[in-house]
């Protein structure tokens, strides 16, 4: 049921605009249970959790390369043009950050310089559902590609039909990322941190999410997987 408010008192604004959230202890217990299930039952846990939480049954979490390539045919041409403009702008910005680092001799025979090296394996969490954030994939995927990251793995929640939004797959195609997995929520973060039969274990996880995803990233950090932020 939708409620409509008309000229609410200023004292009530904080309560009205407060996002729903679980008590911290309860949230930790829920996420810890998810981690225990993924650790114990591997991909089977992911299937059970996806059915329970996302309302769809997934047998093969990895999106096929042909499905990724076909996605552009389902997207409005004007949206594709806009995405390519955004891609070019983001690419030019991050590419400008690659500069040769000067070596400084701080004392005879002692030279110092700054060196940047790519992370080998990263996981990108891309929110999906009713509002797929393909912009997040552009802003995370482009710098990862420029940096020379060898293995980029995308996890994103499927819809009720067990599918990923075409626009996310289209962005993955222009980024030339083939490892896209139909899995979201706290369980996807656990899968990236622990590794499963299907989803590779990564060195660092990037990307925003809800309170369950954020708490799961905290667990990932305690498991030895680097994260971008909480």
Each PLM stretch: what is its role?
Residues 1-120:
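N-terminal Rossmann-like NAD(P)+-binding subdomain of aldehyde/semialdehyde dehydrogenases
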Residues 33, 37, 48, 82-85, ...:
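Alpha-helical scaffold segments in soluble metabolic enzymes
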Residues 1-14, 166-180:
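Active-site-proximal helix-loop elements at catalytic-domain edges
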Residues 104-170:
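Conserved small-residue-rich beta-alpha loop and adjacent elements
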Residues 116, 146, 174, 196-199:
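Alpha-helix termination/capping residues and helix-transition junctions
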Residues 42, 150, 178:
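Short acidic/polar active-site loop segments enriched in Thr and Asp
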Residues 35, 127-131, 153-159, 176-183, ...:
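Flexible, glycine/proline-enriched loop segments at strand-loop-helix junctions
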Residues 176-230:
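Conserved NAD(P)+-binding/catalytic subdomain of aldehyde/semialdehyde dehydrogenases
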């Amino acid at each position: 049921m939708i409620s409509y408010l008309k000229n609410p008192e200023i004292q009530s604004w904080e309560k009205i605009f407060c996002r729903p959230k679980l008590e911290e202890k309860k949230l930790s217990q829920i996420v810890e249970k998810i981690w225990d299930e993924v650790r114990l039952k591997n991909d089977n846990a992911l299937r059970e959790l996806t059915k329970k939480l996302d309302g769809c049954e997934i047998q093969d979490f990895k999106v096929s390369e042909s499905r990724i390539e076909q996605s552009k045919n389902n997207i409005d041409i004007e949206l594709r043009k806009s995405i390519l403009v955004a891609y070019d702008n983001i690419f030019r910005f991050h590419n400008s950050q690659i500069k040769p680092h000067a070596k400084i001799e701080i004392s005879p025979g002692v030279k110092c310089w700054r060196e940047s090296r790519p992370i080998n394996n990263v996981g990108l969490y891309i929110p999906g559902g009713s509002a797929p954030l393909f912009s997040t994939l552009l802003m995370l995927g482009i710098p990862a590609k420029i940096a020379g990251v060898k293995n980029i793995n995308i996890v994103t929640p499927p819809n009720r039909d067990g599918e990923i939004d075409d626009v996310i797959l289209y962005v993955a195609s222009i980024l030339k990322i083939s490892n896209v997995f139909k899995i979201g929520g706290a369980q996807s973060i656990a899968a990236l941190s622990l590794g499963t039969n299907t989803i590779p274990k990564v060195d660092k996880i990037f990307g925003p999410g809800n309170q369950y995803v954020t708490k799961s990233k905290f667990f990932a950090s305690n498991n030895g997987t680097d994260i971008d932020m909480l």
